[in-house]
Amino acid sequence: MKFTLSWLKDHLETDATLDEIVEKLTDIGLEVESVDDRAAFRAFTIARVLTATRHPDADKLQVLSVDTGDGKPVQVVCGAPNARAGLVGVLGRPGDYVPGLDVTLSVGKIRGVESFGMMCSERELELSDEHNGIIDLAENAPVGTSFAAYMGLDDPIIEIGLTPNRADCTGIRGIARDLAAAGLGTLKNTLPDAVKGEGETPVKVILDQDAGNPFCTGFALRMVKGVKNGPSPKWMQQRLKAIGLRPINALVDITNYVTFDQGRPLHVFDAAKVKGNLTVRTARDGETILALDQREYKLNAGMYVIADENGPESIAGIMGGEHSGCDENTVDVLIESALWDPRMIARTGRELGIVTDARYRFERGVDPEMMVPGAEIATKLVLELCGGQPTVLDVVGYKPHTARVIDFPVTEVKRLTGLDVSYEDAFDILKRLGFGVEGDGKTIRATVPSWRGDVEGKADLVEEVMRIHGINRIDPQPLPSHGAVNGRILTTLQIRTRHARRMLASRGMMEAVTYSFISEAQAKAFGGGKPELKLANPIAADMSDMRPSLLPGLLAAAQRNADRGFGDIALFEVSGIYEGDTPDKQRRVAGGVRRGTAKVEGAGRFWAGNAAPVGVFDAKADALAALEAAGAPVDRIQIEAGGPEWLHPGRSGTLKLGPKVVLGTFGEFHPDTLEALDVSGALCGFEVYLDAIPEPKAKSARTKPALSLSLFQSLKRDYAFVVDAAVEAGNVVKAVSSADKKLIVGVQVFDIFTGASLGEGKKSIAVEVLLQPQDRTLTDEDLEALSKQIVASVAKQTGGVLRG
């Protein structure tokens, strides 16, 4: 929200300096984002060229004699092609800083001729990119006066950042009201008396809507006959230009001016272009309108328009139509001031992709009691600037605003903020903010003004009192120290999240943060799409569902990188997924994808050979590493073949702890899944559920145990077992490991063989067993006994026999 200092002072009687106003705005919650006081222009003056003669030593230079208004002409050397006798321009004197050149002027000689200043171009003053000649002002421009004052460039521009709840400050009057309440001046009464009209407005307004659920809660219309439309006055144009608006003509500029002045959007129709009456109705599927931005918009039945017999003339509350717009030929003008449903405005604007100042205000909620005064203000300006004869203001469908009343115990300020504010101070603050107040010395009965639709309860009143009284008046209090070491601050889930994140990053994966919202198609592809997980008001059509998995977002991110030349990429995310609409259905998950040749050991081409594409075992290793880092008992994890439907059925697995606890899934993606998501390439991924890891039975130590190393040499033994073809290698590994958990420290599968020599339906699984004695060197008898234990364990758990 931008405004100039002089514009603010139209509403605020104050002697405060610019710095004081800026500081106070931030103190009361209207954060100042920038201030342009345009001090660089103050030194430049308007000057007239008396004579222009050719430079004796340069064909392209002229020696000017310049009148500065004090009767003492100044000699200036100038190379501008438009420099001539009689031109009125802008003079910079020695000592003046030229912002466009980043230089400070001084007396100098140019080709032997002294120059005591500089005639400036627009680019040199950073007014525009025009530099083909020096500034050429009107002949009647007052010579010797400040150029900044003449052009309105001496008025500082302030820009503040508004939070969505402060709709009242989308108008300069609302900002002035807050400053007055904060003690920085007095709020002026700028509302004009009602304009006395003659005769009824010939164009009637018809509200075609559901009376029980209206989208238009008030419509005011007035005609002003016999206007003379043309350029708006200089003061209005200067203010509009200062805040970034382009002046068009007086009638249009008046509506823009009132929008920013009062926070009340308006619209004007050329009455001669309106056929019949105006009807506020829903749009019809397929209707189109050529809007004022010269773009044609296709409407649907969920949108609302102001239409006449020709069809839509305005997209309600957002933008008018080109057909009925006002131009220099307008004689009779219709002034519209209406109230629109904020949700309808937001939805329509989002669907059409239109962002306007009117939409910005209506979707936040405008002051309902300013509908009629806004029309009166605009009428008064039209009569002053364009003349004409007004009709009686026609108001349709408007119901007086019902004010909200809140009982406010002043003790709530202390309870919620720690700020000590007396009853009298709180009473006075709310009164200055425009609240109706009465009370008994302890509780204030506050009536919320119409422009503060965001104030709904006691906590909101606490905020109002606190920000005006001054947050900076809260005395700092040091945190108490009890002389003891703090206990663990992070929760178990937070610790798991941190450890999993560090582990995946250490494996060469890059962390990504993706949206929690995905499209319906993506959600259904990953087991989601439940009705309760659909957003009532999605920010985009392809972000309609809460995600049931991290993988859709990561796959899309990987594809975006691949499309830009980064095909070998590994991404991970540790965040939440949603299985339902209750808090217990939100899960903490670590997920990741690898694409191309993005393996742990490196990607791309090497002297020893190209890296292989990623596959199921890369995803498995990532999943187990994340679980181990998060504290899962990986030695007890069971790996079952097959995963969810979005993974390849023969190249995926499920990580389980017992028959019921699922810790995660991993694998290569199903081709149908990749096709549905428009993703290509070698891709694998995993998800592990950090909240499914069981709590350790024993309390975990805060420090790592001491490193224990055996004094005795380790040794390896190989075994080959013949088992049924359906037996998984993991079961054999588990059986071997359980034979002697103290002595056996590692089991590795190194060969799987099938053949006729083994018999039908049989296969051989060979494993390498790593033995680590702790207290003595193993004898042949020890090894023989261990071998018997291993063979017996495998036979018992898998039915396998030692291969001969």
Curated annotation (Swiss-Prot):
Q: Which PROSITE patterns match?
A: B5, FDX_ACB, TRBD
PANTHER family cross-referenced by the UniProt entry: PHENYLALANINE--TRNA LIGASE BETA SUBUNIT, PHENYLALANYL-TRNA SYNTHETASE BETA CHAIN AND LEUCINE-RICH REPEAT-CONTAINING PROTEIN 47
Report the sequence similarity comment from the record: Belongs to the phenylalanyl-tRNA synthetase beta subunit family. Type 1 subfamily.
Q: Mind giving the lineage of the organism this protein is from?
A: Bacteria, Pseudomonadati, Pseudomonadota, Alphaproteobacteria, Hyphomicrobiales
Output the Gene Ontology cellular-component terms.
phenylalanine-tRNA ligase complex
Cite the tRNA-binding domain residue spans from the record.
38-148
Q: What is this protein called?
A: Phenylalanine--tRNA ligase beta subunit
- Oligomer and partners: Tetramer of two alpha and two beta subunits.
- SUPFAM superfamilies documented for this protein: Anticodon-binding domain of PheRS, Class II aaRS and biotin synthetases, Nucleic acid-binding proteins, PheT/TilS domain, Putative DNA-binding domain
Which coarse location class describes where this protein primarily resides? cytoplasm
Q: Where in the cell is it found?
A: Cytoplasm
Q: Which domain of life is it from?
A: Bacteria
Q: What is its EC number?
A: 6.1.1.20
Keywords tagged on the record: Aminoacyl-tRNA synthetase, ATP-binding, Cytoplasm, Ligase, Magnesium, Metal-binding, Nucleotide-binding, Protein biosynthesis, RNA-binding, tRNA-binding
Start and end residues of each B5 domain: 401-476
Q: Which GO terms describe its molecular function?
A: ATP binding; magnesium ion binding; phenylalanine-tRNA ligase activity; tRNA binding
Q: For Mg(2+), which residues are the binding ones?
A: 454, 460, 463-464
| GO biological process terms on file | phenylalanyl-tRNA aminoacylation
The chemistry this enzyme catalyses reads: tRNA(Phe) + L-phenylalanine + ATP = L-phenylalanyl-tRNA(Phe) + AMP + diphosphate + H(+)
Say yes or no: keyword ATP-binding present: yes
Question: Which cofactor is recorded for it?
Answer: Mg(2+)
Q: Which InterPro entries match?
A: aa-tRNA-synth_II/BPL/LPL, B3/B4_tRNA-bd, DNA-bd_dom_put_sf, Fdx_antiC-bd, Fdx_antiC-bd_sf, NA-bd_OB-fold, Phe-tRNA-ligase_IIc_bsu, Phe-tRNA-ligase_IIc_bsu_bact
